[in-house]
Every structure is written in structure tokens, then in C-alpha cells.
Amino acid sequence: MPWSEVSPGHFQRPLGANEKFIKSIGDRAHPLGREHWSVTAQARFKTSDALQGGQERVPELHKAWKTMRFAHPSIASIANAETLDYYVPSPDGLEDWMQQTFFVVEEDTSSQQYIASLQPSPYLTAHYLVRTSELILHTAHWRTDGFGAMQLVNAFFEAFAGLDDRDPIDLPWGQEVARLVPSIEEVLDLPEEATPEIKAATAECMATLALTRGAVGVSYQGDLTTLPAGTHSVQGRLSQSETKAIEEACCTRGISLLSAVHASVAATTYAGASSEAKSKPYTSTMRFNLRPYVPEPYSSPAYASALYTGGYMVQVPATHSWTENVREYNSAYRRGLSKGFLRARREYALNVQELLKKNIAMDGPPPSEVDISSIDDAELLVRPVYHGKSGDVEILDVSIGVETLTRQLYCFVWTFRGQLGFNLVYNEAYYNLTTATVLLDTLKNVLLTELGIRDDRAI
């Protein structure tokens, strides 16, 4: 159902089934002051001499933030139990929203430390770290995904570089509602009632969830009673020469870079597993950006603040070699998503919601594998340089991640400015920095070694 005006300046639509099930997962951690799978996108930047730096640039950043809301109003929508609500702001309302959502951080803290302290918000929030010149966007996962979050980073810097003398208050507020995003169910024109074909496709997707049981996992701290703490991460980048060598090696072998990293993530999980677990199969997620599968204009960056993602679980046996795994992953990525998978998006989400309500306890240890998520070439999402009337804005590096409250680790991967980047996300209640660093070093070493770029296996 599309957005409708339920009272003057108040627009509303039902939460989509996928938004609702992702929201229910995130909301479970609210009593702990956290939100599972909340998305965090980062960009470190510098400006030319013509633009102000440090604390002096804050008023301009505020203007850019308000301008960005006009272009992407769904960053200010609020999710209730059954509906999404958006209110056209008055001048005072726009200022109040800015004060609630844009934060200037002057403390001497790293982005990783700061992200670990973030708490849930009804809105998408922005955080400017003055000392390191970093922008962090943080939001619940029901609002967007990794690709969309990076497109929103791009939208912010487009607004910042493109500022003029006009006050954002003077924009034609009320017209922005035409850009409120629809749900994936509406975009794909999915029926309310599932057909037999849709039910069959849903059953196939649901069946893959069982693959997480009895799978190999990384050894973790604590026991089943250990409560989660903050989310931390360890980041790394390969040099431009190493990245180029990896891309050339993948091209020669007829495989994608993502497939090679995925196989290396599997090997990393086995390396971090206990000796008793090393004979178990490895289960991970085949994640897909749905934007290439939806019609125009919904595939464009104008719909960045939308949850357009999907996936299913896959499993490889412990007896498989790296080469066998990379071939299997490459085939799956190349195959992409079927029409049946897309048509099952609503029914699948409804089925998962029902499963979550039952709160069925899993047999055996909880999943603790390293899983993978990729935004591919980040330069297709975030421009390296923005040219404006007052000067240029250069993006030095980017990163993407999520909050995790489970024993699962998530390896995010991308390329930017010719470098392959990694962000390994973990919960500090179950892993420490040393363990995470060793895992990421192992991943990089496996990737370089298996592709013949590094001859030894020393980290």
C-alpha cells in the first residue's frame, strides 16, 4: 500500500513484511540499549582550503543534513508496530529534528570506540567526529541496507559540496513526500495471498535456515549465559598493488573477487574453530542487493533509504578445498536470484516472523561462524571527490558494518580507491581484539596465498 496523507502534513503507510521482520529482530535488543543488525556507514574526508575545516564547518554540515532530508525524507520516517509515519516539518520542527539526529563529537575517540557506544534511535542519525574528520551514519536495518547506507553517505556529501546561500528552511517542504520510499513488496508488486508457486519457493528459502544447525564456528569466550556487550570491529585494507594482483588472478581463473573472499572467509572460520568442530560443514549467507532486480526508478540512488536486500543460506562440507568452495560460490553469485525467490519475498518474511514468535531454542551451540557481506565496488556508491562552488570534498576511505549481539562475526568487504577493504565486526562479550585481528590476518593471508600472490603462509 502506498503512502497516504492521514492528516495535514502526516503521511503513513503500512510496514512491509520484510521491514517488519527485520525490525522485530533489531527491537529484541532494545532492553539492552542496543539494536541487532543496526547499520553503520563511515567516511573519512577532507576539504579544500576554500571550505572550512574542523569545528568551523559544523554550520555547513547542519545545512547539508537538512538539505539531505529534503532529498531523502525517509531518513526521518518513524516505524511503529504496524506503520511507517512521516511528518512534514515546520521550521522549528526541522531544527528540532536536526538537534536530535546530528551529533558533533569533539572527544579524542576512534570511530570503532564511538560506534560501540551508539544506541537505538527512531531516526537515521549522523555523527561528525571532529578530530578524525569522519562522518558516521547509523540506522536501524529496517530502514536500509549496506548498499543504501553508502548511497546515503554519497547523498550527504553531494549536499555538503553543493551548498549555496539558500537556507534549507526555505526549501518547498511538503513536496519531499513524493520521494518517500515504498516497501520491497510494493516495488515487486507482490500479491497479498501467496500462490502455490510462491509457497513452494518460500519453502525452499526457509529450508536453508536449517543449515545453520551443526555448522562449524569460531571458538568464543563465555558460555550460553553470557550476555552480549558492545560491538567492535577490526579493519584492514590491502595495498593497491595487492588488490590489482588479486583482481587479475580472479580474472585469470574466471571467478569473481567476492567468490574468492567468500571462500577465504570459510577457511578463516575453520582456522578459528576448535579441533572438534573442524569436521563440521560451513554455513554462510548468499546476500544479494535487490536493486538490480527491481524496476526503475526504484533501482536508483533516490531510493537509498529503503530495505532492498535478500539472501539465503548455503553450506559447504569440511572436506572441500578452497578451490572447490570458490567454484561453488562463484556459480551461486553468477546465477543470481530467480523469479521465484523474488516473488517469495513477502511470504518468506511472514514465515520468518512466525518462526521468531515461537522463539524455538536451537539444539547444540549457537552459530559462531564468520559470515560475509559485500558492497562490491564502493566507488559506484560513494564518489571519491565532490566538486562544489566553494571547493572540493575528497573521500579518503569508507567502511560499512552492523551491530551484532550474537556470537556470529560479520566480514564486510568492498573496494575503494583501488584498495580491497575489510571490516570484521564482532561482539566484545564473545571475542577480543587479538582474536579478531588474527582472524582478519588469516583471511587476508588465505586470499593472497590461494591466488598465488603470496607463496608462504606466514601472516
From Swiss-Prot:
This is Acetyltransferase pigO. It comes from Monascus ruber. Its EC number is 2.3.1.-. Disruption phenotype: Produces the angular tricyclic shunt intermediates monasfluol A and monasfluol B that retain the omega-1 alcohol. Belongs to the trichothecene O-acetyltransferase family. The gene is pigO. Coiled coil: none annotated. Keywords: Pigment, Transferase. As colorants, MonAzPs are widely used in various food products for centuries. Moreover, MonAzPs also possess wide-ranging biological activities such as antibacterial activity, preventing hypertension, lowering cholesterol levels, causing hypolipidemic effects, and displaying antiobesity and antitumor activities.
